[in-house]
A protein has these predicted regions:
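Conserved beta-alpha-beta core of the PfkB/ribokinase-like small-molecule kinase fold
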Residues: 1-62, 79-80
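Conserved phosphate-binding/catalytic region of the ribokinase-like
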Residues: 3-7, 56-172
Length: 172
């Protein structure tokens, strides 16, 4: 599916989402599988715990060049995220909220980020700009922050309206 989407010119995103149990504590096998997938990926999401699987944060620019990645998003939990795009990197701070349950926060962030790119009209990697990435990062950040304020993985996922209500309120 990744290869086909990539060949069709679609934006292909990938979240490593490493789980020890799933890989029987074999992080090396997971890293090998990730490296086999990367030629078909445009936007990669990795966490602090996963960054060593792709050579470490200090080598992300090289990884992007070798694998022709459009963007890499490194999530750093409650502290926010760092984006690598177009030869630059920048951070977005995490939102200070009262967390009830962190289950699904990364998925909420990633879903918010990707949906924002689509809502902004990005259908191909060439459509993506720094302002679009910045807006998508904020959208994802709000989504993740809303998620952790409720219990449950699925039931805590915010709606588009909830996210956009915060954006409108903060724009005033």
């Amino acid at each position: 599916a990744l290869r086909l989407g990539h060949e069709m010119g679609k934006i292909v995103s990938f979240d490593i989402n490493y789980r020890n149990l799933m890989w029987k504590d074999d992080k090396d096998s997971c890293a090998k599988a990730v490296m086999e997938i990367l030629p078909y990926v445009d936007i990669l999401k990795i966490s602090e715990e996963e960054v060593d699987m792709v050579g470490g944060e200090e080598n992300i620019d090289l990884l992007m060049k070798e694998q022709k990645l459009t963007a890499v998003i490194l999530t750093i939990g409650a502290d926010g995220a760092r984006v690598f795009f177009d030869g630059k990197s920048f951070d977005i701070a995490g939102r200070k909220v009262k967390a009830v349950d962190a289950t699904g926060a990364g998925d909420a962030f990633w879903g918010g980020f990707l949906s924002s790119l689509l809502l902004q009209g990005a259908t191909h990697t060439t459509d993506i700009t720094v302002p679009m990435i910045q807006k998508a990062m904020e959208y994802g950040n709000i989504s993740g922050a809303l998620c952790v304020q409720k219990k449950g993985a699925i039931s805590s996922l915010p709606t588009r309206e909830e996210i956009e209500q915060i954006i409108r309120r903060e724009a005033v």
